[in-house]
Amino acid sequence: YRIRNYTMKFPDPKIDSLAHLKAPRRSPLASAFRSSQEEYNQLVKEGTLFDRDILDKERERITTLLRWNGYYGFNRDYLGYIADSSFNQNVVDLDMSMKPYRKVLPNGSVEDQPHRQYYIKDVTVLTDYNPMGVGEDASFMATDTMLSAGVNIVYGRNGKSIRPSVLRRSTYIRPGQLFSEKNIEQTYSAFASLRALRNVNIRFTEVEERDTMKLDCYILTSPAKIN
């Protein structure tokens, strides 16, 4: 089968606009951490073969664009296709569809809601997190807390094993920003390059504030050498 007609139009104008984004002009000074140009190239096109692998990659591509632009709760399972091959001409008409966000209410029922963008509220870096700790080692004991350019830095038992400015510069997730998976990837990469740290783990907690969805971010790290 070949695709005769292909439609990708979503009822939410903001999501529809993001799904049709064109690649921004790349600065020669831009980070080479991840080439994002491919994410802006539509994979499903009229006249091409009907290929299930390509259809799945297109769902992944749009999911990536949305998660780069605030849609923390979005995943590829919200996207699907409606295919019509009733023409008996080895062609198919294809529409991409999007399911609404399904929120589980306190009473256990499920309510369909629009997909919402999330903003970063607070960012906290914990420098002595022990993911394998038991007993006393399982608890985090703060010995010092600092605020550096909006990032909370909490030192533990090992004290200031790394300068606050280094941790801040390695943190691409900042309060007030739209959630972006790209910022998470850059933060993981920056922290992985710090030899004084290991076992970096980034977690989020949802917070609803004045009808705005926000996320508290926790960057959990362990010192490479325990004093």
Over which residues does each language-model region extend?
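Soluble periplasmic/extracytoplasmic beta-strand elements of cell-envelope proteins
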Residues: 93-97, 201-203, 216-220
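Gly/Pro-rich turn-and-neighbor structural signature
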Residues: 78, 203-204
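Extracytoplasmic/periplasmic membrane-proximal domains and adjacent transmembrane bundles
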Residues: 195-200
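AMP-binding (ANL) adenylation modules
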Residues: 207-210
